[in-house]
Amino acid sequence: MLQITKQRTTTPKAKPDEGNLGFGVHYTDHMLIIDHDEEKGWHDARIVPYQPLELDPAAMVFHYAMESFEGLKAYRTPDGSIQLFRPDKNAQRMINTNHRMCLPSLPVEDFVQAVKAIVEFDQDWVPHAEGTSLYIRPFVIATEPHLGVRTSRTHKFIIVCSPVGAYYSTGINPVKIFEDEYTRACPGGTGFTKCGGNYAASLISQVKAHELGYEQTLWLDGVEHKYVEEVGSMNCFFKIDGTVYTAPTVGTVLPGVTRMSCIEILKKWGIPVSEERLPIADVMKASHDGKLEEVFGTGTAAVISPVGELRYEGDVAHINNGEIGEITHKLYNTLTGIQWGKLPDDMGWTVKI
């Protein structure tokens, strides 16, 4: 169990307008930091006023992308209490990421304790407005000043928090996606991790998508370039002739917490779910045959993002007449209902602060 010291700020910030929060724009009064080195392991856990970090310019994180991160939220329920959604899954995923990136990891229970501690300390920053939440960003960075390519001897685990607005400020609406020539991940790589390099390398395709009038990129596998894997920075699902398909998490696909939750809910509802590899050709054929019923992405930020149009090699699939699908909508309402405490948590997923 962590021994966390706490220092409250003497200059608290003014709270932002909950009707105009945006995403990742505002930050709470405090942050959590835990140091790590080879001799002491994790030590000096502390909550301090939010402030810039002081790092050596040669810190290895700047030169070799030696870092990892997570993303989860705290939700204000109708009775005013605060809860988290499956934080243990984020903790385990960070352990898996850190193993791949040669970074040290907090045990699951310490990760969850740290998250609960900073949220409780800054609980006044958890917004009350409909659809808002407190986004929580834990991350690990290599801090040793060294330009040789090897593992770092010193690290920091840090959590910052940001009150965020409703992702769909005008309602949940389908987006348009397209497939591009770029590759997100290959077998043996870091596709299953949450490391910054994965996201930086995806931006060029995102820019191209926007230039062509599309919101997101559909990522295919990096070997044969024929199997669907992710959409943008989300997991993706395809409902074809009554069955819901999503890519297997076998090394190139991020094991999303929302993805996992959707699969469990769908199975509870008795809807067939396949985690077999799905060729993009089969998706387009299903569209032409009138069997492509719904497409949606899943992730912490948006929860569920419906897709209304998919472009592949000049061919365009129009999904459900550009309207949100029945299962997509039901999943969104169910997940957000559990997260914000408006529906009973029969799955045991929420953790009270």
Regions found by a protein language model. Give the residues of each.
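Active-site-adjacent loop/helix segments that line or gate small-molecule/cofactor pockets in enzymes
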Residues: 25-33, 47, 60, 172-220, ...
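Conserved phosphate/anionic-ligand binding catalytic regions in large, soluble enzymes, centered on
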Residues: 56-73, 301-305
